[in-house]
Amino acid sequence: MDANVSARINLMRILLISGIVFVHVPYNPQWSPFLGNYGMLDWLRVFLGESLFRIGVPCLSAISGYLLFRRGLADFDYWKTLKTKARTVLLPFLIWSGSFFVVVYAIQRQGLGFGYLPDTINATPRQWLSMAFAVEATPVNLPLYFLRDLMLCILLSPLLALLVSRYPRVTLLALLAYAILPLPNGIFLKKSILFGFSAGIYASLHGVNIKMLDRFAAPIAAGFLAIAVVIAVGLYYTGPDFPLWLDMALRLTSIAGIIGSWAISELLVRTRFGEKLGRGSGLSFWIFCGHYPLLVLFWMIWNRTGLSYYPLFYFTAPFIAIAILVASHNLVRRLAPDLLAVLTGSRTGAKRMATQPPQGAQAGYSPQQR
């Protein structure tokens, strides 16, 4: 893999995960963006949280599928992969998700936190398993359902690779229908993750030149953003109970965002800002796992201040959360690098990327980064 692709993948990860932070900003029903109380600001909330940044989940899963099989099916060692992913995905998921459940339970035992998070005190042991580890439903650390579904994709990866290699069109069309049609989720909590992961496998196994559309990056990016704007307008005027056709269009747009976000990465990676963001990967995982507890904490504090201008909270809380997570990541990296390695699945950061070869040279990913 050349250094440009490697940097763009890291850039996409940090941008998409930062965008996902906006998706998870909490609000009360009286401050729903679909009420239009704040006019254009509410539409912007819908655009960011319900349209544009919904591309994050399928895009991130596509990256995972692509990297997992980028050396081909013949060199794929399933048992070695499971062992690696147990350390790089499963263990961090269990720690981040389980520890937040314990914190929430302890807080609610003191009579705090009710209404902000699921009721852990009166839940059954079966419900606890989902709250802590997303066994049947989303966990209390909401975004981490992605890691749970990603592990399922990894467990199914030999079967998915076999189907995608032998019957690519039928397989991808079937998974696309599963993702966008109102079908039961089955064992997955988010259906688009399976399609994104399989699309990434397809790109690897069939040798797709993922840079072939780079010369059209600007019009592709503009077209995707225009579609996201149109979808946001429809959501704003019909939400929160969207008509079925619009909900399907939203799901399809989020999947199309795989191509759109890749085009955007081509435009950004050559800028100084994009080059800097493309140097590391551990930070994005840290932000992904840690942002939701911070947002809930900020929301609890906000509701005690008596302030009523919700846009102030919406447009400041994500940036404060990201700033805290960047600072804490740097602090833990300096003071407890072994702990950081466990919490981020042994992902390397800027130090490794600082020595990456120049553009056009080959840049590999460690099993941890894949």
Curated annotation (Swiss-Prot):
Tell me where in or outside the cell this protein is found.
Cell membrane
Q: Which UniProt keywords apply?
A: Cell membrane, Exopolysaccharide synthesis, Membrane, Plasmid, Transmembrane, Transmembrane helix
User: InterPro entries given for it?
Assistant: Acyl_transf_3_dom
Q: Which Pfam families match?
A: Acyl_transf_3
User: Looking at the record, which segments are called Disordered?
Assistant: 350-370
Q: In which pathway does it act?
A: Glycan metabolism; exopolysaccharide biosynthesis
Is Cell membrane one of the keywords? Answer: yes
Gene Ontology CC entries for this record: plasma membrane
Transmembrane feature ranges: 14-34, 46-66, 88-108, 144-164, 170-190, 193-213, 216-236, 244-264, 282-302, 307-327
Instruction: Answer whether the UniProt record assigns the keyword Transmembrane to this protein.
Output: yes
Membrane topology, from the record: Multi-pass membrane protein
Disulfide pairings: none
Extract the GO molecular function terms from the UniProt entry: O-acetyltransferase activity
**What's any GO biological process attached to this entry?**
enterobacterial common antigen biosynthetic process
Q: Member of which family?
A: Belongs to the acyltransferase 3 family.
- Which function does this protein serve? Required for the succinyl modification of the seventh sugar (glucose) of the octasaccharide subunit of succinoglycan (EPS I).
Q: Which protein are we looking at?
A: Succinoglycan biosynthesis protein ExoH
- The gene from which this protein is expressed is exoH
